[in-house]
UniProtKB/Swiss-Prot annotation:
GO terms for cellular component: ESC/E(Z) complex; nucleus. The keyword Ubl conjugation applies. Disulfide bonds: none annotated. There is a cross-link at K327 (Glycyl lysine isopeptide (Lys-Gly) (interchain with G-Cter in SUMO2)). GO terms for molecular function: chromatin binding; histone H3K27 methyltransferase activity; histone H3K27 trimethyltransferase activity. Residues 395-414 have a biased composition (Polar residues). This is Histone-lysine N-methyltransferase EZH1. Keywords: Chromatin regulator, Isopeptide bond, Methyltransferase, Nucleus, Repressor, S-adenosyl-L-methionine, Transcription, Transcription regulation, Transferase, Ubl conjugation. The lineage of its organism: Eukaryota, Metazoa, Chordata, Craniata, Vertebrata. Polycomb group (PcG) protein. Catalytic subunit of the PRC2/EED-EZH1 complex, which methylates 'Lys-27' of histone H3, leading to transcriptional repression of the affected target gene. Able to mono-, di- and trimethylate 'Lys-27' of histone H3 to form H3K27me1, H3K27me2 and H3K27me3, respectively. Required for embryonic stem cell derivation and self-renewal, suggesting that it is involved in safeguarding embryonic stem cell identity. Its EC number is 2.1.1.356.
Length: 747
């Protein structure tokens, strides 16, 4: 095997020179194409304007111009000036009018465009500067280094100018492809010249072949070369990487070129894609594969698809609901019910999750068939399993279905001690064909309804419950039930809940005394071990919420409240912990009542229900625009939520440098991880101005696992008053940004 010689310095210099020349040519070509495109658009728009103008001129020529009767000037007004109006038409006489001056109208305050929002919207960090903001000639002359510092904050990355800025090292995908293809032509020419010299002897030795055979052979070789495009030489990527090192190493560039040039079949499915369950190509897949899109796109915290508030989705809860909805009816549902099989009623009594059968009753209803004697040693033990959302498809393999053809009980490879299992005897029947969609749907339904085959059959609609039962036996899912320990977790609430209020107070006082830092909540996911010092909730001094995967008896879980009043004092554990009452935890205060969202006894659930006041937008007496309230509110009453874009602290620092130059900022710290920016997106409360004597105050509240900013009344506010709250500026910033302080008429 021939080992390629390493490239010489002369070769490297040659390729670098080619890279530089081709890159400059492509840059010039891009500029020329941009200029030509702008000229073409200008010519097209100018032609459209000329066409419209010509049509209007033709219409004006068809109209008849009638002279206006002269108005006699009114005498006796010595202070009014007299104006003369002369017409351009020769047939019209001049007109004389008295001039009446209008009073000066106050200008409307400047307002920048913004999009209305009703809740926070999380966005990604902008690592590329979208545009260079115009600050005016004054800022440009006084602070010449501002634009340079702004570009440096984005590492010199400006949108749309990767290839145009001199000295830029970023190459877009389009220019990268064109550059590699252009350099590849030089590589092909070199190889062709080398092949011509090396293959000369072979061609001379085959001159005795007929002319027709030689032409045919050359035609076949030419077609092969044209059909298969040669991958660029490694020297090309090495030369580009040496000229533009910030774009990556040669291996990265090679992989980038391969991804950009791969031809994808438009009809081909992604590698990890399940065919549509309602389509003709539906396949029989496991439950986790059928629900993959559901678990990926559905947010378990917001209960909606494509959630734009949480960057990640919590894993499905491994614990079942308290109000169990699984029940096997003791009576058959029809003539084809599986309960009509011999021993099926005993099976229903034994495997009903709601029934509390004693061991004596289990032994009395136990039925053993002679055909089961050989397989009794490999009986299935009920394993401790949670919600089937976390089960893997390997547990549902039907590898043991052949061994269970005689005895209708599933088995596993490893035997475990368990009570003797029930065997159901049935009459031989014809095999029923199941489609891939039906099998997949059955596995999805079985994770919710378990052994309630009558309900599963009604949901399928194409199979009887007897056929569903037979398929379940074949799938080895007959005993795949959650244990009573997980279905009915031990509840020790009476004494435990009284201790929780003191526990919450201790934790809250500890948080208040130690630090004022608030961290974003992320659900913990360690179901096999308790919450200790390594738990993310404890590390960030957050409570474990209902979205966490820890045990329900976790000492760090927040239990909610059992208040009977309005939950607006520190006697309420939720109010003390600066959080709203959770409708899933607080069942006695009224937070869980959803009959009327406005008439509710609990006063600590206003943000999650959106019980905001009617706000008005008008010019402010202090600065710019202001927010006014249309209805009167009482002290500590919820007014509105401060909504905007959720951005990181680093992104807030980059945006804040621009906002400081504009002397207008809508940034609001949410916690140590995120900031709410209402500059581009927000609601009307964003126009509330700053004051050292405000009538409102802002408070960050935990609402169902999310930090949200609520604006509350600091005192009783009358209808029509302008809303102010303290921005908590420093003394220097307050004098810099707030020039006028409002008059405190109302004490």
């Amino acid at each position: 095997m021939d080992i390629p010689n390493p490239p010489t310095s002369k070769c490297i210099t040659y390729w670098k020179r080619k890279v530089k020349s081709e890159y400059m040519r492509l840059r010039q070509l891009k500029r020329l194409q941009a200029n030509m495109g702008a000229k073409a658009l200008y010519v097209a728009n100018f032609a459209k304007v000329q066409e419209k103008t010509q049509i209007l001129n033709e219409e004006w020529k068809k109209l008849r111009v009638q002279p206006v009767q002269l108005m006699k000037p009114v005498s006796g007004h010595p202070f009014l000036k007299k104006c003369t109006i002369e017409s351009i038409f020769p047939g019209f006489a001049s007109q004389h009018m008295l001039m009446r001056s209008l009073n000066t109208v106050a200008l409307v305050p400047i307002m920048y465009s913004w999009s209305p929002l009703q809740q926070n919207f999380m966005v990604e960090d902008e690592t590329v500067l979208c545009n260079i903001p115009y600050m005016g000639d004054e800022v440009k002359e006084e602070d010449e280094t501002f634009i340079e510092e702004l570009i440096n904050n984005y590492d010199g990355k400006v949108h749309g100018e990767e290839e145009m800025i001199p000295g830029s090292v970023l190459i877009s995908d389009a220019v990268f492809l064109e550059l590699v293809d252009a350099l590849n032509q030089y590589s092909d020419e070199d190889e062709e010249g080398h092949n011509d010299t090396s293959d000369g002897k072979q061609d001379d030795s085959k001159e005795d072949l007929p002319v027709t055979r030689k032409r045919k052979r050359h035609a076949i070789e030419g077609s092969k070369k044209s059909s298969k495009k040669q991958f660029p030489n490694d020297m090309i990527f090495s030369a580009i990487a040496s000229m533009f090192p910030e774009n990556g190493v040669p291996d990265d560039m090679k992989e980038r070129y391969r991804e950009l040039t791969e031809m994808s079949d438009p009809n081909a499915l992604p590698p990890q894609c399940t065919p549509n369950i309602d389509g003709p190509n539906a396949k029989s897949v496991q439950r986790e594969q059928s629900l993959h899109s559901f678990h990926t796109l559905f947010c378990r915290r917001c209960f909606k698809y494509d959630c734009f508030l949480h960057p990640f989705h919590a894993t499905p809860n491994v614990y079942k609901r308290k109000n169990k909805e699984i029940k096997i009816e003791p009576e058959p549902c029809g003539t084809d019910c599986f309960l009509l099989l011999e021993g099926a009623k005993e099976y229903a009594m034994l495997h009903n999750p709601r029934s509390k059968c004693s061991g004596r009753r289990r032994r009395r209803h136990h039925v053993v068939n002679a055909s089961c004697s050989n397989t009794s040693a490999s009986a299935v033990a009920e394993t401790k399993e949670g919600d089937s959302d976390r089960d893997t498809g390997n547990d549902w393999a039907s590898s043991s279905s052949e061994a269970n053809s005689r005895c209708q009980t599933p088995t596993k490879q490893k035997a475990s001690p368990a009570p003797p299992q029930l065997c159901v005897v049935e009459a031989p029947s014809e095999p029923v064909e199941w489609t891939g969609a039906e099998e997949s749907l059955f596995r999805v339904f079985h994770g919710t309804y378990f052994n309630n085959f009558c309900s599963i059959a009604r949901l399928l609609g194409t199979k009887t419950c007897k056929q569903v039962f037979q398929f379940a036996v074949k799938e080895s899912l007959i005993l795949k039930l959650p244990t009573d320990e997980l279905m009915n977790p031990s509840q020790k609430k009476k004494r435990k809940h009284r201790l929780w209020a003191a526990h919450c107070r201790k934790i809250q006082l500890k948080k208040d005394n130690s630090s004022t830092q608030v961290y974003n909540y992320q659900p913990c996911d360690h179901p096999d071990r308790p919450c200790d010092s390594t738990c993310p909730c404890i590390m960030t001094q957050n409570f474990c919420e209902k979205f966490c995967q820890c045990n329900p008896d976790c000492q760090n879980r927040f239990p909610g409240c059992r208040c009977k009043t309005q939950c607006n004092t520190k006697q309420c554990p939720c109010y003390l912990a600066v959080r709203e009452c959770d409708p899933d935890l607080c069942l006695t205060c009224g937070a869980s009542e959803h009959w009327d969202c406005k008439v509710v006894s609990c006063k600590n659930c206003s943000i999650q229900r959106g019980l905001k006041k009617h706000l008005l937008l008008a010019p402010s007496d202090v600065a710019g625009w202001g927010t006014f309230i249309k209805e009167s509110v009482q002290k500590n009453e919820f007014i509105s939520e401060y909504c905007g874009e959720l951005i990181s602290q680093d992104e807030a620092d980059r945006r804040g440098k621009v906002y400081d130059k504009y002397m207008s900022s809508f940034l609001f710290n949410l916690n140590n991880d995120f900031v709410v920016d209402a500059t581009r997106k927000g609601n009307k409360i964003r126009f509330a101005n700053h004051s050292v004597n405000p009538n409102c105050y802002a408070k960050v509240v935990m609402v169902n696992g999310d930090h949200r900013i609520g604006i509350f009344a600091k005192r009783a506010i009358q209808a029509g008053e302008e809303l102010f709250f303290d921005y908590r500026y420093s003394q220097a910033d307050a004098l810099k940004y707030v020039g006028i302080e409002r008059e405190t008429d109302v004490l």
